[in-house]
A protein has these predicted regions:
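Helicase motor core with emphasis on the C-terminal RecA-like subdomain
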Residues: 1-216, 220-257, 266-268, 278
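Extended Lys/Arg-rich polyanion-binding regions
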Residues: 163-166, 172-189, 206-210, 214-218, ...
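Short cysteine clusters
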Residues: 544, 549-553
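Cys/His-rich metal-chelating microdomains
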Residues: 556
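Short, non-ligating residues that shape and space the ligands of small metal-coordination modules
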Residues: 559-560
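Short Fe-S-cluster ligation motifs
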Residues: 575-586
Length: 586
């Protein structure tokens, strides 16, 4: 199914041509009448096929992919397709993403400008901020999260006198499926940004940077808000600011620069990935993702090369040897790799860290290192995560008319730990075995929106105990997938937890939380527009043609439990029940 839009989009009151066309490619139509299900090609496979075709026609292009692993995979698939056709351009395709060294990124940027490289599969890292334009085409693999991002990506194609082509390929997730059915949302007005300026984890680094320019005075509350006094007091207590008669100054004796504390991309420091054979830093990964992607024993892909993670050096917890639990016959062959084809710390310590440190502590600890070795292996790894949520306070409450559903919003502590991983074998990701990990627990103080159900609600819906966990889990996934339609965010900016009986609420509960320290305002926007949020989620799930759940409705690519258990029908029942019992509809 191919849906095309031609014409113009609005930007700053003026019409801007969208190049030749903007296209959204949907997967094959419904299969309900077929005895044999149709296997849908993934958006990444579609993108690789299309990129190879563009390159063979002489085009230069960027393919925007949602994840680092996705960028590597699409680049490898494009090279494979061109190699199979005997194309000389197979070696002129690369990947570009965060985690590459600066010299690698600069070389790739220059190569795509000059035409030495014909195509790059990239994350949003090439979306803006770099002088790369005048390409022939762009491919956007999956909705990029906002109309702003989409227009930035489209703007990379075309130049004076030579219009370009931009293609949007819908991914298998609830939001993309919804947008294909409602294309008017794609070409609407640019969204308003959502940010919580009172969040001390956001405000404190900016106050520190401002104090390095001119002293902070009480009158600056006009600019920084009522939270300024408390934030300044904490910065002084933690040794970042010094009090002088003229105001509060940055402590110039500190080793770091104040600007180092402010990360506009929201990361919290990087883990260096080091080749054990040479001592060379081959890349970096943010602290929040490190445990899930470069744990001891993980298989890590970098520029089409395969690496085996030997260790992840953490100051808090020693790690087990990478080979622990690996079948001896399956240990990877080291050398000659080719291009192309902890135990948790005490609860008291975590709570103390969460409550007393404004500058994210991960910025101070820049010494984590993942040691890797290059290998040739058909093995891949997939980690699993355990999550728990502690309710710290309640700031907003909505009780529905019959009292069977209660919605809340407020601060929570979300604790996660990577617990184990599956060892898989290509090409079909055949399961070999599960291996336990001993990594530390990380606690994120953030904001959540959650709802609870009474026994009367479960009885009214006819949801029994056997189906409850799958119902809540599927509903959580679907609501996370659709929230970006209501709040300016990405599903990767969110997290969630569903439980049949939560310790703090004493009831079946679904939590959706911001994946940012102190919160980002996304789930508050969801709370305030919960009725619209639930309505869109219900439509996305109920209109999906699958029988028992798929990535387009209730499965999640970031699920730490392997998308088990899930009940699509239970989610439809629960969402329909929530629709008239959600806030934001008055």
């Amino acid at each position: 199914e191919l849906v095309l839009w031609q014409g113009a989009i609005m930007a700053d009151e003026s019409e801007v041509d969208i190049s030749s066309f903007l296209a959204a490619l949907d997967a094959p139509p419904g299969t309900a009448t077929l005895k044999v299900p149709v296997v849908r090609r993934s958006a990444g496979v579609e993108a690789a096929n299309l990129a190879a075709a563009f390159i063979e026609e002489g085009a230069r292009l960027l393919a925007f992919v949602r994840s680092r692993a996705g960028a590597e995979a699409v680049a490898a698939q494009v090279r494979d397709r061109l190699s199979a056709r005997g194309s000389a351009n197979a070696g002129r395709v690369g990947a570009y993403r965060g985690g590459y060294l600066p010299e690698e990124r600069r070389a790739l940027e220059e190569a795509i400008r000059t035409g030495e490289v014909r195509a790059l599969a990239t994350t949003s890292a090439l979306e803006m901020g770099l002088d790369i334009s005048g390409l022939d085409a762009t491919i956007t693999v999956g909705w990029p999260g906002t109309r702003t991002s989409l227009r930035q990506q489209i703007g990379r194609a075309g130049r004076a006198g030579a219009p370009g082509t931009s293609v949007l390929i819908a991914s298998d997730n609830p939001l993309d499926a919804y947008l294909v059915r409602h294309p008017e949302h794609i070409l609407g007005k640019v969204e308003a940004s959502v940010i919580d300026p009172s969040n001390p984890w956001v405000l404190a680094p900016h106050v520190a940077a401002a104090a390095a320019e001119i002293p902070i005075r009480p009158s600056d509350i006009t600019y920084f808000g009522m939270e300024l006094r408390g934030v300044v007091g904490r910065l002084v207590a933690d040794g970042y600011l010094k009090r002088r008669p003229a105001g509060f100054f940055w402590d110039a004796t500190r080793p770091e620069r104040p600007s180092d504390l402010t990360d506009l991309r929201g990361a919290a420091g990087d883990v260096q990935i080091v080749d054990a054979a040479t001592g060379t830093v081959i890349g970096t990964i943010d602290q929040a993702s490190a445990d899930a992607h470069v744990f001891p024993g993980a298989i890590y892909i970098h520029q089409g090369r395969t690496f085996h993670v030997l260790s992840l050096n953490s100051l808090a917890t020693p790690t087990a040897p990478a080979s622990q639990g690996w079948p001896r016959a399956l240990l990877p062959e080291a050398g000659g790799g080719t291009r192309g084809s902890g135990h948790p710390g005490s609860r008291e310590r975590e709570e103390a860290q969460a409550s007393s440190i404004i500058i994210p502590p991960a910025r101070i600890d820049d010494t984590r290192v993942a040691l890797v070795e290059e290998v040739r292996t058909p093995l891949r790894t997939r980690s699993a995560t355990h999550t728990s949520v502690e309710v710290c306070a309640i700031e907003e409450t909505h009780v529905c008319g019959d009292g069977t559903v209660t919605w809340h919003h407020g601060p929570t502590n979300v604790s996660t730990r990577v617990t184990d991983y599956d060892l898989l074998r290509l090409p079909g990701l055949e399961f070999i075995r599960n291996i336990e990990l001993f990594l530390p627990t990380h606690t994120l103080p953030t904001k959540s929106t959650w709802f609870t159900l009474t026994p009367a609600a479960l009885a009214a819906m006819g949801i029994n105990a056997a189906d409850l966990a799958g119902t809540l889990h599927a509903t959580e996934h679907a609501m996370i997938g659709i929230l970006p339609l209501v709040a300016t965010c990405d599903r990767w900016d969110l997290g969630g937890l569903s439980t049949e009986l939560h310790d703090d609420t004493g009831a079946p509960t679904v939590f959706i939380h911001d994946a940012f320290r102190g919160g980002a305002g996304h789930v508050l926007a969801g709370f305030n527009s919960a009725r619209s949020w639930v309505a869109a989620t219900l439509e996305a799930v109920s209109s999906c043609d699958c029988e028992s759940g798929c990535p387009r409705c209730v499965q999640s690519p970031k699920c730490g439990n392997g998308n088990e258990p899930l009940s699509k029908q239970g989610a439809i029942t629960l969402l329909a029940y929530l629709l008239d019992r959600a806030p934001g509809g008055e």
